[in-house]
Amino acid sequence: MAMRTRAEKRMRKFLIEQLKTRQQNGARIAQGKKSEHELIKNNLGPQVFVFRNLFSGQVLYSQVPAYHENQINQQFLSPNWQNRKPSRRQDLWKIMCVVNFNNYEYAIAAYKGLVDLRKTRDVVQKKEANEMRKKNDDGNIWYSGQFRPTYTQEAVADLTHVIDEFELEGTKIFWANEWHRGDDKHWRADLVEHDKLPVYDPRHQTVLLDIMREKAIEAFRENNTSEETIENATEPETA
C-alpha cells in the first residue's frame, strides 16, 4: 500500500477541516425562514433544496444549501412511530433535487407552499392523508425496514402542485436521480425544465451544493440583465 507523504496528509487534514467549516456555516445560515433581503445579503440564490433521508425516506426542505435542527422541528410537527422526528445526521440526509426559480418571490412562495402542504398533511388533514397512503397487510404505511417511500412520493407531488398552482414559470429542477421525478405527464413543460445534478462524491455534498448556489446566482443575474436590456430597448423615446 502506498504511503502518504506529510504534504498529502496535511492537505487531507486541511480539506476535511474546510468541509466541516462549510457544514457548520451552512447549518447556521439555514436557521429560520429567509426573506428576499436575507437571501441576497447571504449571497444565496432563488432556490429550494430538497433533502431525502436515506434511512426513513422522509424529506426536508431548505432555502439554503444546508439544513438546521430548527427546520426539522418546524417541518415534522406531529411525529409518531410511522413518521418519527428524524435525526440531523449529515450522513443520512442526501440531496434529492435542487430547484432553481426565476426570482426570489417565486422561491419564497414555493418554500412556504411546500412547508404548508406538509403541515396540512401531517396535522390539519392527518386522517385523510393517511387513508390515501399505500398500506401493508397490517394496515400500516408500507415500509421496508424503516424506509417508507410514500414520503418521497408525496414531496414530489407537492412540488408539482406548488409549481402548477402558483404558475412558477422558468423553474428548473436538478435531480440526483431522475427516477424520483416520475412520469413527464405530471409536470407542465411550459413551467418547468428538468436536468441532472453533476456527479459528485457523496462525502463532498456541501461542495456540490455550494456550486449549485453559485450557478443559480449567476443565472438569476444574467436573466435580470437580459430583462432590463429588453425593457430599456422597448421604452418609448421622449422628445
From Swiss-Prot:
Its main location: nucleus. GO terms for cellular component: mitochondrion; nucleus; ribonucleoprotein complex; ribosome. Signal peptide: none annotated. GO terms for biological process: mitochondrial genome maintenance. InterPro entries: Ribosomal_mL67. Keywords: Mitochondrion, Nucleus, Ribonucleoprotein, Ribosomal protein, Transcription, Transcription regulation. Pfam families: Mhr1 (PF12829). Disulfide bonds: none annotated. GO terms for molecular function: DNA strand exchange activity; single-stranded DNA binding; structural constituent of ribosome. It is found in: Nucleus; Mitochondrion. Belongs to the mitochondrion-specific ribosomal protein mL67 family. Component of the mitochondrial large ribosomal subunit (mt-LSU). PANTHER family: LARGE RIBOSOMAL SUBUNIT PROTEIN ML67, MITOCHONDRIAL HOMOLOGOUS RECOMBINATION PROTEIN 1. Component of the mitochondrial ribosome (mitoribosome), a dedicated translation machinery responsible for the synthesis of mitochondrial genome-encoded proteins, including at least some of the essential transmembrane subunits of the mitochondrial respiratory chain. The mitoribosomes are attached to the mitochondrial inner membrane and translation products are cotranslationally integrated into the membrane. mL67/MHR1 also has extraribosomal functions, being involved in regulation of mitochondrial DNA recombination, maintenance and repair, and generation of homoplasmic cells. This is Large ribosomal subunit protein mL67.
